[in-house]
Amino acid sequence: MKKVTLILVLFLGFIPMLNAQWTSPGNGTTYTMSELVNVTDGVVTFDATNYHIHADLTISQNDVLKIDNGFQKIFVENALVTILGSMICENANRVSVMGDPSFSMRFENATNCDLKKLYFSDGAGIKLIESDVHFDDVKFVYFTTEYCHSAIDIFNCNPVIENCYFLLNEGAAIGSPANGQSSPKILNCEFDSNVNGANIPQINLGPGSEDTIFVVGNLIDGTYAQFHTGGISIADLMGTGDTKILLKDNIIKNNRYGYNQQGYHLNSTIVGNQFIDNYHEDNPMNGGSGISIYGMDDNNRAVIRDNVITGNLWGITAINGFDINLGTEEDWGNNQIHDNGNSGVVYDLYDNSTCDIMAVGNDWGTTDEQEIEDHIYHQYDDPGLGLVTFIPFVGYDAIEETNTALFEVSPNPAHGRFTVEGQGKMTITNALGQIVLTKDIDGQEYIALPRGLYVVRLGDATQKVIVD
């Protein structure tokens, strides 16, 4: 009886060893899944159809994990797969990596990692630590936040994430922390209703590195989120770096808000995007902007061109300190900003600071100057706020100037008053064609008019003048 008991104890003690973690030797070996079955002492197995990873697996520095086309699925049983070397997945067919019930991955100081045509589902998160991993045509579905805050957590690296799809993940799809510097390239991806039950955007980035953060050609849609999620946020709240951002050709719709840029030393170019129907916020004081620029000082910069901003609770909100360029006389903004608002009031642009904003050459959905003025909240509503210069705007440039050498208007633009120098009958009309002044002049005449665009006619000559 004692002999039987001893044998049973020895046998039971041996079972955990079959699934103990395995680490590659770091001698430059390239491993396929089938080769791992032969060398990992039961950590990796094959059941004639699919591969299974039963315990933690580490690919050491100098070694390579290569995923080939010889199978379709890998089931990972609550294990951590760590890549310290390289991982290559250049598949013609899609390979699924599925949690059974969950898994996590960690790339740390990894090099030459190229992942294509993978389908990750039911994971607990993928961490990239100083590892410039390339993801191309990869799907990330049903990730939890058990291992990290996002489906992909980035720390001090510049990965390329292109042609990828993120669906119904519990946390953000892609995130980086406030205490690191990372500049991912996020290109032509689709983000569909990520984040469940938290005030977090689908793309949630901290400070950038020396490289530019690229967010280009993506669809960020929050339509089916159980609790409405934000679109994109890029923030440097501690003044860590000097972040450069290109936000271009994205469609950002049906989120709690569209794009948030917040903190110190952020410099963005925002061009060719669509910020549409980002109104899923019960309290407008807590969000709902198509674009929100919240600066700690005027080193929070944004050049905003050729965007469509409509259907949001607020079109553009500008808060505290910033340097925002929405269009100048020399370089018109050409943004379409209209039909944004809440509580029965239209708010296409809200300047909640002492900073002035140039917003020349935009389409506000109307050519009625007073209507545009009513849709912009700034110094004319509260003398303590900055001034928004929005004239001329799209629709104002239909008036042609003629024979401008016959008389002189100066300064132009003018601040409250200007002079007309010439001889003859002078007629001044506003942008609606209404006559505001008629007078015979001989020499220099001083004119004071309210803010707006005016047409000065003297005989057969015509000139436009802007009063701001």
Regions found by a protein language model. Give the residues of each.
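Bacterial Sec-dependent N-terminal signal peptides
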Residues: 1-24, 400-402, 459
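Extracellular beta-rich repeat passengers
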Residues: 21-396
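C-terminal outer-membrane/trafficking sorting elements
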Residues: 403-410, 414-468
